């Protein structure tokens, strides 16, 4: 492959190649050298875009957050209340994590990412601000408890996805409502159960 093939899109080509490696073997396999080899460029070629592995992993994380948030935003378009938007967002996050476990794990490895990078911090802060507005708008939430409720919600979603990925939980439905377990848990946390706050369609039990 000629070195000029990418015509300025080498960075994206490297990210594409790195994501393929990530999906196949996990974060341990994503190195500058392996990514360059997968992209059919010299080992030195990535240096202009990603000076080290942390920079490459951070760029991958930004890509993955963008993908996950895009899916969540699409799901939220059908929601009409804060509770419905929260459930739709959480459902989309769970679906993404279960579909792409290696990507999901890597996205939260702040010990391996550069969280001072504006692109990463901006997308994460925007994600929390968006759902935080919906949490604060819940009838059951007082303004001075909204942050605690947001942290609880984030912890519930992340913990559930992580335990599903690691095989600690299996796909199951709530015994009382018949809804996917994670939907029932989120509704219980935000006080949406029996208040019309649940999204009408939940594909699959998790």
Give residue spans per PLM region.
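Amphipathic alpha-helical packing segments from all-alpha helical-bundle domains
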Residues: 114-140, 147-152, 176-191
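N-terminal intrinsically disordered/low-complexity leader segments
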Residues: 1-9, 20, 79, 194-206
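Hydrophobic alpha-helical connector segments
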Residues: 59, 73-102, 126, 149-153
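Helix-turn-helix
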Residues: 13, 17, 21-55, 59
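Short hydrophobic clusters on alpha-helical segments that form packing/core surfaces
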Residues: 14-22, 30, 64, 68, ...
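Amphipathic C-terminal alpha-helical segment
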Residues: 154-172, 188-199
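Amphipathic alpha-helical linker/stalk segments
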Residues: 2, 62-86, 121-133, 137
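Amphipathic alpha-helical segments used for helix-helix packing
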Residues: 98-115, 162-170
């Amino acid at each position: 492959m000629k070195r000029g093939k990418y015509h300025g899109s080498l960075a994206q080509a490297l990210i594409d190649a790195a994501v393929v490696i990530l999906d196949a073997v996990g974060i341990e396999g994503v190195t500058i050298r392996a990514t360059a080899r997968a992209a059919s460029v010299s080992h030195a070629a990535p240096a202009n875009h990603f000076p080290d592995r942390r920079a490459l992993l951070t760029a991958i994380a930004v890509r993955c957050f963008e993908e996950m948030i895009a899916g969540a935003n699409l799901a939220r378009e059908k929601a009409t209340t804060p509770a419905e938007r929260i459930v739709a967002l959480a459902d989309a996050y769970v679906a993404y994590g279960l579909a792409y476990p290696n990507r999901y794990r890597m996205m939260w490895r702040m010990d391996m990412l550069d969280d001072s990078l504006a692109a990463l911090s901006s997308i994460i802060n925007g994600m929390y601000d968006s759902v935080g507005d919906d949490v604060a708008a819940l009838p059951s939430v007082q303004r001075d408890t909204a942050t605690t409720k947001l942290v609880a919600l984030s912890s519930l979603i992340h913990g559930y996805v992580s335990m599903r990925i690691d095989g600690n939980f299996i796909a199951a439905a709530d015994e009382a409502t018949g809804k996917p377990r994670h939907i029932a848990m989120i509704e219980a946390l935000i006080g949406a159960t029996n208040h019309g706050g649940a999204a009408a369609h939940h594909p699959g039990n998790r």
